[in-house]
């Protein structure tokens, strides 16, 4: 009876895990989509109908003018960007930051592969850039620089972490514009714009900043990850607009103080970080010219009236780079990973990394893995060590759980007697059983608690592996070169001995891409199942026989780091449960149960005549 209850509970928990995963990846996205549509409709209704003045709009080069990235860079005068993590240039035409490579990150695990391209100039296939400046008040005739204005560099030399650059433009009508750009040793640009009025009358200008991206980017397509426009906008808090969502809304505006906004990918982002005291008219928008869509995050600050002989100025910042947790920052109690979030006094800038709804578990999971990575120098080993710690933390609960189940085994004679007394009265039987459990201080469902508590651990580790750049291209040993990617080996081509890729087979490909680690995980799960006697109920037996096979196929496409965790967790569970069983005087039947499987298979073979 005890083993039947335990097996039933485990089956329920595993089935619940599958249902939770289904809810997490399929049902919730639809609910979120409906909620987002309502939110967009509400936001549009309360947004100002017309910013004053109009926000800058993206330029749309003719389709025939599209050129290669290198050609576009070479045909405009530029100031070089050269820092330990960034390489690129500032276009003097428009004074845009539109050429940026992340030199510490490569497109593939091959260190000789190209560096990640973040920004690309207008005229290429996928322009992506940041622009800053001034907008004249409605009705004003003041001529301000735009995307076609050619600026001049004061002095010479590249923009480095120790040498800012200053650009200048004189409109010939009494207004002189200067822009000083500095960059730190990570991904933060600081931009100071000044305008001096030597004309004959005061002039009113609005400071602006924008990030513009042409073309709809390829996204991962997973609900657990946001890719698109993002911002933490004062009292309106975190705002996330996928490309599809902003296509439907067209434009949404927000009046905010102490906000930031930008565009985020899975691992990279560009974000505008205005002064925390600035009053902003922030906006997300989607525009279309021909077949090309343009996505833009921008803001206008309050107007500045510059008197004759006076100077107006504004400061802003641009984050453009990798979403490294230590650089962006982590807002979590008792943790000193402040990054830009703390350094600049920003409002929840750590949410640029999509920690998810269960951030209170995901963040500690990442911090633990990151700590042990710095101890061992390998994220795979860090995963193994953190799993051991989790097992140690849950050990008292697991011990009490199995002790309770041992008591259940001790009262089985009483339960059997009750079944004989009440063969047809199920309600009375349950009442009497509960009385026995209460008297003996037995919790009949305690056996599933350790497994239930593992579910949030599983999902938090999956989230960390999937969204954090620290896990990207992080190797383990042997053939695992990237813990955030699925195991690259395939059993159906004999792990590379046969010259074809099973995952490329039409329709069946995703089901044939089963690597070595998913198989190891399935074997460890099978041993864990065999730690308990075979259930007498045929349905339970069928579920438990097929569960390791099902999970092997399910986890084959998951990150290798997660599969390694599950396999290691199964192994530790077998060791831990065997220890607890012996400690409670229960015989460990693992080897006998395994042998019985093969004995049954042998006995099923037809006898030789």
Swiss-Prot record:
<keyword id="KW-0653">Protein transport</keyword>
<keyword id="KW-0472">Membrane</keyword>
<dbReference type="Pfam" id="PF14849">
    <property type="entry name" value="YidC_periplas"/>
</dbReference>
<dbReference type="GO" id="GO:0005886">
    <property type="term" value="C:plasma membrane"/>
</dbReference>
<feature type="transmembrane region" description="Helical">
    <location>
        <begin position="375"/>
        <end position="395"/>
    </location>
</feature>
<feature type="transmembrane region" description="Helical">
    <location>
        <begin position="546"/>
        <end position="566"/>
    </location>
</feature>
<feature type="transmembrane region" description="Helical">
    <location>
        <begin position="449"/>
        <end position="469"/>
    </location>
</feature>
<keyword id="KW-1133">Transmembrane helix</keyword>
<dbReference type="GO" id="GO:0051205">
    <property type="term" value="P:protein insertion into membrane"/>
</dbReference>
<comment type="function">
    <text>Required for the insertion and/or proper folding and/or complex formation of integral membrane proteins into the membrane. Involved in integration of membrane proteins that insert both dependently and independently of the Sec translocase complex, as well as at least some lipoproteins. Aids folding of multispanning membrane proteins.</text>
</comment>
<comment type="similarity">
    <text>Belongs to the OXA1/ALB3/YidC family. Type 1 subfamily.</text>
</comment>
<dbReference type="Pfam" id="PF02096">
    <property type="entry name" value="60KD_IMP"/>
</dbReference>
<dbReference type="InterPro" id="IPR028053">
    <property type="entry name" value="Membr_insert_YidC_N"/>
</dbReference>
<keyword id="KW-1003">Cell membrane</keyword>
<dbReference type="InterPro" id="IPR028055">
    <property type="entry name" value="YidC/Oxa/ALB_C"/>
</dbReference>
<keyword id="KW-0997">Cell inner membrane</keyword>
<dbReference type="InterPro" id="IPR001708">
    <property type="entry name" value="YidC/ALB3/OXA1/COX18"/>
</dbReference>
<dbReference type="InterPro" id="IPR038221">
    <property type="entry name" value="YidC_periplasmic_sf"/>
</dbReference>
<keyword id="KW-0813">Transport</keyword>
<feature type="transmembrane region" description="Helical">
    <location>
        <begin position="507"/>
        <end position="527"/>
    </location>
</feature>
<comment type="subunit">
    <text>Interacts with the Sec translocase complex via SecD. Specifically interacts with transmembrane segments of nascent integral membrane proteins during membrane integration.</text>
</comment>
<dbReference type="GO" id="GO:0015031">
    <property type="term" value="P:protein transport"/>
</dbReference>
<feature type="transmembrane region" description="Helical">
    <location>
        <begin position="9"/>
        <end position="29"/>
    </location>
</feature>
<keyword id="KW-0143">Chaperone</keyword>
<keyword id="KW-0812">Transmembrane</keyword>
<dbReference type="InterPro" id="IPR019998">
    <property type="entry name" value="Membr_insert_YidC"/>
</dbReference>
<dbReference type="InterPro" id="IPR047196">
    <property type="entry name" value="YidC_ALB_C"/>
</dbReference>
<protein>
    <recommendedName>
        <fullName>Membrane protein insertase YidC</fullName>
    </recommendedName>
</protein>
<dbReference type="GO" id="GO:0032977">
    <property type="term" value="F:membrane insertase activity"/>
</dbReference>
<feature type="region of interest" description="Disordered">
    <location>
        <begin position="35"/>
        <end position="63"/>
    </location>
</feature>
């Amino acid at each position: 009876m005890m083993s039947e209850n335990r097996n039933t509970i485990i089956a329920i928990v595993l089935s619940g895990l599958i249902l939770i995963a289904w809810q997490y990846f399929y049902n919730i996205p639809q609910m979120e989509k409906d909620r987002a549509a309502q939110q967009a409709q509400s936001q549009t209704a309360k947004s100002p109908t017309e910013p004053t003045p109009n926000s800058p709009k993206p330029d749309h080069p003719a389709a025939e003018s599209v050129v290669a990235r290198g050609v576009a860079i070479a045909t405009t005068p530029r100031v070089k960007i050269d820092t330990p993590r960034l390489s690129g240039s500032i276009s003097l035409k428009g004074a845009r930051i539109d050429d940026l490579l992340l030199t510490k990150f490569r497109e593939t695990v091959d260190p000789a592969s190209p560096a990640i391209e973040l920004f690309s100039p207008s005229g290429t296939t996928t322009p992506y850039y940041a622009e800053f400046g001034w907008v004249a008040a409605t009705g004003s005739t003041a001529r301000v620089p735009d995307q076609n204005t050619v600026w001049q560099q004061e002095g010479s030399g590249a923009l480095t972490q120790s040498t800012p650059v200053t650009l200048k433009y004189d409109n010939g009508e009494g207004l002189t514009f200067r822009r000083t750009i500095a960059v730190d040793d990570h991904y933060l640009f600081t931009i100071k714009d000044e305008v001096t009025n030597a004309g004959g009358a005061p002039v009113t200008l609005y400071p602006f900043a924008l990030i513009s991206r042409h073309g709809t980017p390829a996204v991962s397509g997973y609900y657990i990850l946001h890719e698109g426009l993002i911002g933490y906008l004062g009292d309106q808090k975190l705002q996330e607009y996928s490309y599809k969502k902003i296509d439907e809304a067209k434009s949404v505006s927000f009046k905010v103080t102490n906000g930031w906004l930008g565009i985020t990918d899975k691992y990279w982002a560009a974000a505008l970080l205005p002064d925390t005291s600035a009053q902003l008219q922030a906006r997300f928008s989607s525009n279309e010219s021909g077949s090309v869509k343009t996505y833009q995050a921008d803001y206008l600050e309050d107007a500045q009236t510059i008197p004759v002989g006076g100077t107006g100025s504004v400061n802003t910042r641009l984050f453009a780079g990798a979403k490294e947790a230590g650089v962006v920052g982590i807002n979590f109690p008792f943790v000193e990973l402040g990054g830009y979030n703390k350094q600049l006094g920003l409002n929840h800038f750590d949410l640029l990394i999509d920690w998810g709804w269960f951030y209170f578990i995901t963040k500690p999971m990442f911090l633990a893995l990151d700590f042990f990575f710095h101890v061992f120098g390998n994220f795979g080993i860090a995963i193994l060590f953190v799993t051991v710690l989790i097992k140690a933390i849950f050990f008292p609960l697991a011990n009490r759980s199995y002790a309770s189940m041992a008591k259940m085994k001790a009262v089985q004679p009483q339960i059997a007697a009750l079944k004989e007394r009440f063969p047809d009265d199920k309600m009375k039987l349950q009442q009497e059983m509960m009385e026995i459990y209460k008297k003996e201080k037995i919790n009949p469902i305690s056996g599933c608690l350790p497994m239930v508590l593992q579910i949030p651990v599983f999902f938090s580790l999956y989230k960390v592996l999937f969204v954090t750049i620290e896990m990207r291209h992080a190797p383990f040993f042997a053939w695992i070169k990237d813990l955030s990617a699925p195991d690259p080996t395939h059993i159906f081509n004999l792990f590379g001995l046969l010259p074809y890729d099973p995952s490329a087979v039409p329709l069946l490909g995703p089901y044939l891409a089963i690597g070595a680690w998913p198989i190891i995980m399935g074997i460890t799960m099978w041993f864990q199942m065999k730690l308990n006697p075979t259930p007498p109920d045929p349905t339970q037996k069928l579920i438990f026989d097929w569960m390791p096979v099902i999970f092997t196929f399910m986890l084959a496409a998951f990150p290798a780091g997660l599969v390694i965790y599950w396999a290691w967790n199964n192994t530790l569970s077998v060791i831990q449960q065997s220890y607890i069983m012996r400690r409670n005087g229960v015989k460990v039947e693992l080897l006998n149960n395994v042998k019985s499987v093969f004995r049954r298979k042998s006995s099923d073979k037809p006898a030789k005549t």
